Amino acid sequence: MPGTRGPRVAMLSVHTSPLDQPGTGDAGGMNVYVLELSRALARRGAEVEIFTRATSSAQPPVVDVQPGIRVLHVPAGPFEGLDKNDLPGQLCAFTAGVLRAEAHRSEGWYDVVHTHYWLSGQAGWLAAERWDVPLVHTMHTMARVKNAALAPGDVPEPQGRVIGEEQVVAASDALVASTREEAEDLVRLYGADLDRIHVVPPGVDLDTFTPPVPSDATARTALRERLGLPVDSPLILFAGRVQLLKGPDVLVQALEHLPEEVRLVVLGGASGRPTAVRELEALAHQCGVRDRVLVHPPVERRRLADWYRAADVVAVPSHNESFGLVAAEAQACGTPVVAAAVGGLRTVVLDDVNGVLVDGHDPLAWADVLGALLADDGRRARLAAGARAASRRFGWDEAAAAMLDVYAQATKRRPAR
């Protein structure tokens, strides 16, 4: 990598654009990760071009996000109507689009290919070989991990994805894991070379996700009024895609066993199944709590911080999370988190320090934990203070510095492969 300038990074995110609204469709923490990491890399002098599949004829071919960051919409298959599981059939077209973009550059333009999720890894593998640059890959989720922790009624990941992930793991010059547990899964489940794995925790935008100022009850009341939320009710917030993997149904069923005044706010849209929100509302009706569940579409990130601040507790009942960005963001806003003791959530949430971990997904167990915390103002205040302190562990500038080191190490080791 040249020493006179920052690296030129081809960032691939096939199935979801960093410009999409998180909380709907396939847009979630990975979108935030790709965009915020790119911004932090650009602040350190890198030039980042993000390749993503075009999903609308109205999308411009290129979007200049800010100096040093461009998003390129690559036509690959129909704009609409493709499920994520249909995308392997469009990878040849996507890869060709990525290679065409480089063809308009001077030879050797890109210094590194950084891919996100296995679909991108497949395309990036070919691009990196063609350009003779290192391939750095971040899994974000793994089929074997997801299939071992399926929610009741959820559909397992196909074997084709497992094979694709094995290929990408073997081809990568460097693998980036968000936590040590994820690194161990890469070795245990995919036979990854430990020497090629780098643990780089994602960051949180600590300028956006901040504690409320002022933090008194009057300010909380005004905030809830502005958001259209009940002023006097204890509020549990679920923020994320409405899908079985994320476990919002656990909270709806738990609500049946909580005091009448408690409200659950579901901030997110359907993912995978277009009827997911309606099905969750039907479950709430079946449990007799429909009037206590408030469903709101996802909001842009600066507004999201206010929703975290307005809640008494943020609940993350996911069946699996490689990291748990919602938990980290909520903590940065000074809101205690109740989370499932799975995956990366065990790294983000330190039990009884900045939140509470719950074993399993039994609604009664969740009701017990949530009810006890909502009834204990002193404990919530202590956990809120711990949450604010713990959030300082995660910053995007630190993540970018570590990632630049990963790129440099991958470049050094590539000739030996």
Swiss-Prot record:
Biological process terms in GO annotation: mycothiol biosynthetic process
Protein residues bound to UDP-N-acetyl-alpha-D-glucosamine: Q21, P22, G29, R241, K246, V299, E321, E329
Catalytic reactions of this protein: 1D-myo-inositol 3-phosphate + UDP-N-acetyl-alpha-D-glucosamine = 1D-myo-inositol 2-acetamido-2-deoxy-alpha-D-glucopyranoside 3-phosphate + UDP + H(+)
Subunit structure as annotated in this protein's UniProt entry: Homodimer.
A Pfam entry, by short name: Glycos_transf_1
Keyword Ubl conjugation: no
Gene3D superfamilies: Glycogen Phosphorylase B
One term of GO molecular function: acetylglucosaminyltransferase activity
EC number: 2.4.1.250
Residues that bind Mg(2+): Y308, R309, A311, T335
UniProt cross-references to HAMAP family, sorted A to Z: MshA
Enzyme class, UniProt record, top EC level: transferase
Family from the record: Belongs to the glycosyltransferase group 1 family. MshA subfamily.
Record carries keyword Transferase: yes
Chain sites annotated for binding 1D-myo-inositol 3-phosphate: H15, D26, A27, G28, G29, M30, N31, K84, Y117, T141, R161
Lineage: Bacteria, Bacillati, Actinomycetota, Actinomycetes, Micrococcales
Function: Catalyzes the transfer of a N-acetyl-glucosamine moiety to 1D-myo-inositol 3-phosphate to produce 1D-myo-inositol 2-acetamido-2-deoxy-glucopyranoside 3-phosphate in the mycothiol biosynthesis pathway.
Keywords: Glycosyltransferase, Magnesium, Metal-binding, Transferase
Native species: Xylanimonas cellulosilytica (strain DSM 15894 / JCM 12276 / CECT 5975 / KCTC 9989 / LMG 20990 / NBRC 107835 / XIL07)
Name listed for the protein in its UniProt record: D-inositol 3-phosphate glycosyltransferase
